[in-house]
Structures are given as structure tokens and as C-alpha cells.
Amino acid sequence: MHGSGSLLACLLPPLLLLGAAPGPAGALSEEEKHVMVELHNLYRTQVSPPATNMLQMRWDEELAAFAKAYAQQCVWGHNKERGRRGENLFAITGEGLDVPLAMEEWHHEREHYNLSAISCAAGQMCGHYTQVVWAKTERIGCGSHFCEKLQGVEETNIHLLVCNYEPPGNVKGQRPYQEGTPCSQCPLGYHCKNSLCEPIRGPEEAQDLSSLVPEAPSSLATEASSSRREGIDSSLATEPPPFLVTEVSGSLATKVLSSVETKAPSSLVTEDSPSMATKTPLSLATKVPSVLATHSLLSLDKRPATLLPKSTHDPIPKSADKEASSTRMPSRIPESSLHPKISLMGTREPLPLSQEEGEAEAELAHCSEILASVFPAQEKPGELQTTLKHKGHSSSKSLSNSPSASATANAVGGRTLALQSSLPDAEGPGKHGFRSGSNASPGHVGGLLLGLLLLLPLVLAGIF
């Protein structure tokens, strides 16, 4: 029995490393979702001049599922079926998706936007920025996907990020927000928090949270409770970790016995059979960092996440967040890669004309009208207006296949393509282009296979 425990101790670190590696699908982690919401709210509090009616942004799983489904199509262009949803796009080559870089690229457009005139500088784009700081938008959901081939782009192996928003921004003739004293015009039912209008939540908020957390399969809950009873000392059950108490929904908690509330990593007990759990030494179970043991209950692709290093943040800023704040890991902003990267950025296409619903002031104009009010006019229908920048000089071109470099991308040795949305009848996969000599991302499948080959001798040694 002791030998089996030693084998598990040897196998655990490489297994955790494999689990931490991003998969081919490139789904957003819980920490990335949290960072996305936090950066949106940070930039919304930093608008200058300040806003009187800026609502607090929160995560929406339905929007996230919608964005994920479109990202999986691997198309470099806006979703024509998005209805009354705002949309921002971003794509990048390299080792993985860089959420802070995407947000920085979108926010960088503020330098070209004139709030008083409700206009954007000639030859520039501002649609990303105005959507990020649109005061009446309060829900966001994003999805990402690793595309070996992105339709409409010549480069391969690209991480595509799609974010959808409700209510949508970039409405013709309207300012992103009203300038003045922060929170002085918060809607009824909202109160001020960090210069943002936050909804006043009641006791029923915990019940609302449970509806957003997918229930675990009954077989998984039974296996978890069985293995934990057999393999974990009952004395540990007296100290349930806070993140299990505050962030697991009521519907899920009723399916798992009270012995679930232990310090043992959930990834170990849900993946191993009961017999394996009985052989795991207690010292091993308690030494694994809890950040590696947290379980993603809000996976975009609805699959249970296991053996992945995730934050304990719930991406939806609800009342439970206050109780769990002491256990949350700090947001970590990924450092810029030393390898050259290529990032692509797509503006939020003006909203299509649709049926009247929601607020009266959110009436949407025809795409061509909104295009004229938000973005500079194009020389020909269907052309993409981009700006090509290099360190030695700069030039502005209106081309359907031209890269655009930003200062941020240059700082990390890469280039950025900004997608200027064309009119709906001219939009198509062939209308958006991308060219670059920068390197493509390393093969994700090759790295995973190499790790599995390294683990095979260890597993065989433990069996025989």
C-alpha cells in the first residue's frame, strides 16, 4: 500500500503540469474570465471625464456560451446572427491567449475617440473602446478557441477571442456615457460602488447563483462522496475550505455528502477510483496546493474541468464574492512573451436593424448609418480600413488585406490586425485578411503527446 502511495506522489506533479497546459480548444479558464470582468470594470471607472451612469459589468454564462459557439467556427469576422448583442473580437498567435493584452488593445482606442463630438479620428477605430465603456452595458460573456486555420486569415494556429455584450453598445447618435459626478445618475435599484452603479442584491441572490452553476452528474457526486469517506480522515471534515462553502451552489451541495467539505483536492478524489483513494497517504492529500485542486463549475464548454490550476473566483460579482474574497488568489497578469506574437483585433460591427425590444433609447439604426457615425468612411464598400505602423515610419491604407500594428504589439515584438467591419452585404470571409512573417504558435498536440510518453514508463513501473 505504501508503494502505491509513493507511485502516486511521483505521478502527481507531471499530471498536474499536463492538466495545466492549455488544450487545443483554448477554453477560457476561471481566472481569465475573472480578469476579463475586472479589467472591464477597471477601465469603466477610469473614463475621463467621469461617468454619471456607468453600470458595473458582470459575467453572463449564456453570452459566454453564445460567444464560445461562434469562436469554434474559426471565422475572422463578426457574427451575423448575433442579434441584439454587442461584439468584440481579438486573435493572436503564440503560446496562448493573452486576455490582458486583448483588453489593452481595445482600451487603447480611447486615444482616438472624441466624447464631446461622438466621433473617431480619421483613419482610426474606436468601436472596441466605446463598447467596453458603454454605460448601459452590464453583462459580458466571452469564449475562445484555438484555430489551426482561421477563415479569412492566412496565418495558422491562432487563438480567437469573442466577447458578446448586453445590452449592446455603439448605438447611433448616443454617447457611451453621460459625463459628470460618478454615480450621480444611477438607475433605481442600484447603489454606488467604486464609481460604478452596482445592482442592490437581496437574500435571494444565492439562489440566483445556483442557477448559473451546472449541476454535477449524480455518478460523479456519488463517486466523490464514496472516495472521500474511505480515503480521508474524518477530522479533516471539520474545517471545510471557504471556497467550497461560498461558491458551490445549493443544488450541487445537496448531491454531495458533507464529507466533501475537506481539504483534499477535488481533482484527486473525483478522478481516482475509491480503491485508489484509500491508498493515498494523508500527508500527500494535504500538501497539494488548493489552487491546483479547485474545480471549475463554470466551464464554457460544459465539461467538468479536472487537474487544472484555476482560481477560486466566481466570475459573476455576486454577494458570495464578498465572503470568498479572503480566499481568492490575486489576479495575475501574464507577462509578455519573449517570442514574437501576432495579434488580431476586430471591431464591434454596428448592430443590425432588428425588432423593437428593451429600452426605447436603444433603438438600432441601419448598419451603414452607424458605420458612418462610429467609424471613418471607407473609400469603397467592402474594403477594410487599417493602419500600418512600423518603428521607422507610419502610413495609413484602406485595404482588404493589410496588417495593422499597435504600440502594444510592437512592445512584445508582434503585430496587430484591426478588423474594420464592412457593410453586411459586403461582409464575408474573404473580406478580412492577415499577413505576417512572425512565428506560429508551438504545436499543442505535440507537447501533450510528449508528456504522455514521459508518463508511460512511470505508470508501467507502478503496475508491474
Swiss-Prot record:
InterPro entries per record: Allrgn_V5/Tpx1_CS, CAP_dom, CAP_sf, CRISP-related
CC per GO annotation: extracellular space
CDD domains to which the protein is assigned, alphabetical: CAP_PI16_HrTT-1 (cd05559)
Pfam families xref list: CAP
SMART domains (UniProt xref): SCP
Modification comment: N-glycosylated.
Residues listed as glycosylation sites in the UniProt record: N114
Keyword terms, alphabetized: Glycoprotein, Protease inhibitor, Secreted, Signal
UniProt feature, compositional bias: Low complexity: 395-411
Compositionally biased tracts (Basic and acidic residues): 311-325
Localization, UniProt: Secreted
Source domain of life: Eukaryota
Signal peptide: 1-27
Region span, Disordered: 208-241, 260-281, 304-347, 386-412
GO MF assignments: peptidase inhibitor activity
Domain SCP per the UniProt entry, residue ranges: 37-165
GO BP terms in the entry: negative regulation of cell growth involved in cardiac muscle cell development
Main location group: secreted
SUPFAM superfamilies named among the record's database cross-references: PR-1-like (SSF55797)
Subunit organization: Interacts with PSP94/MSMB.
Family indicated by similarity: Belongs to the CRISP family.
Protein name: Peptidase inhibitor 16
Underlying gene: PI16
